[in-house]
Amino acid sequence: MEMARISQIAAALACCALALPAAAQSSRVEKTQAEIALEQAKTTFATQKKARDDANAACAARDYEACVKAGDSYRKGMGGMQDYALALKAYDRACTGQNGKGCASLAYLNMLGRGTDKNLAEARRLYKQSCDYGEVSGCAGYGNMVYTGTGGPKNVTEGTNKLRDACERDYKWACDRLVDLGAFDPNDSAFERLKDYR
């Protein structure tokens, strides 16, 4: 009888143990895809806001690479509202600190007229300054503007050379642009005959 009672108790405990996970599952609330997406967006925004705040603080302390990051966050609207005026200020501070990326980003906004009046001559000057600081994207932008005569005199040879240099530094846009423009090798004699034709 004692053995039967132990068996009954063991069976009752086993039933209770099995019932607990089933009860816990039935009371668990699943999240919808929208709720999951909202949580992820809030987390991403908080991370981006902190990155923007950190970049602004470092920019104020004359970390010019951080100024570029702050400018990017304002231009793209990451970590807060999109604000081209603040992006321009951050990029200008970076460019003034001789950061080539800052000058190239400032040139891009001037070229498009975002946060400022469209000014192609200023964009060209800033792309050249960026290139002079060693920024490959600035060299590509400057080369493109010189090749096409945008914002200043056209010079196919100089433009081709700048684009080719940027392409050789693995800047894909410059390589694609050379193909799009049908740019010839400036050292090729056929190029000399055709350079004024374009």
Indicate residue ranges for each PLM-predicted region.
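N-terminal leader/linker segments that initiate helical-solenoid repeat arrays
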Residues: A23-K69
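Hydrophobic face of amphipathic alpha-helices that form TPR/SEL1-like repeat modules
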Residues: A37, K69-K76, A90, S105-L112, ...
